[in-house]
Design a protein with these regions (language model features):
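Acidic-enriched, low-complexity/disordered segments with a strong bias for Aspartate over Glutamate
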Residues: 6, 49, 78, 110-113, ...
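N-terminal intrinsically disordered, low-complexity, charge/repeat-rich segments that act as generic
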Residues: 1-101
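Generic detector of short, locally flexible boundary/turn motifs and exposed helical patches
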Residues: 2-3, 41-43, 101-106, 125-129, ...
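Basic/aromatic-rich interaction segments and small domains that mediate binding to polyanionic partners
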Residues: 10-37, 79, 83, 122-137, ...
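Short, basic/aromatic beta-hairpin or loop at an interaction surface
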Residues: 103-119
Length: 207
């Protein structure tokens, strides 16, 4: 989608000032926000690309007014409500007022280390061959999807060169669809993944 999360090339937002020696977390609550996101992701009620889509779908003013983990937490709440795991009232009050949903997979304390080490690999097996070859010139699709995409807006329609063939992976643009329902079989559809190099002048002009 063409949202404020895709800020590459946008003007009027000022320079980026990297924080020297930036900590992983700026406040204790951010640790909890990440832990909640990981724990709820283990329920299997959504996948990582659906969660990214939820973050990107926040209203622009709200998105721009939030910190990184505030965005994570708000999107997590929205996903939990959409799956009827909690109610909006429970999110506001911080107290459970309805019985827990039965049959939902949970991440127990003793399984956390193994789950984090295992991760969520996106590589899939295939008998097909890559469509493109190293050094081949390709043009990025000129498109304006309503959902999540990993193709930045500023490269769409531009010509680049294949410099990496990175394997056969789940396609985020496909697996993020239908974010208001649990992932179906189509979420596991794979495509070849390429690294494409674009020249600066191709993207931004001679300046």
């Amino acid at each position: 989608m063409n949202g404020v999360h895709d800020m590459g090339g946008l003007q009027c937002f000022g320079p980026v000032h990297p924080e020297p020696h930036e900590p992983l977390f700026h406040a204790p609550w951010e640790r909890h926000a990440m832990a909640l996101t990981v724990a709820m992701g283990a329920t299997g009620q959504w996948n990582i690309d659906q969660m990214r889509s939820a973050r990107e779908s926040l209203p622009p003013a709200q998105y721009l007014g939030m910190s990184y983990y505030q965005i994570w937490l708000k999107a997590l709440q929205d996903m939990m409500v959409s799956r009827q795991l909690v109610t909006a009232h429970e999110c506001r009050e911080g107290q459970m007022s309805t019985p827990p949903v039965a049959g939902v997979r949970t991440l127990t304390r003793d399984a956390v280390d193994a789950a984090l080490k295992r991760g969520s690999p996106a590589v899939r097996e295939t008998s097909s061959q890559p469509v493109f070859t190293l050094g081949q010139r390709v043009r990025a699709r000129l498109m304006h999807p309503s959902g999540h995409t990993r193709l930045p807006r500023y490269v769409r329609g531009h010509v680049g060169t294949i410099h990496l063939i990175q394997g056969f992976h789940v396609c985020p643009d496909i697996s993020s669809r239908h974010r208001h329902q649990a992932p179906g079989p189509e979420a596991d559809v794979g495509q070849w993944l390429y690294g494409v190099r674009f020249e600066g002048a191709e993207l931004w002009g001679p300046q």
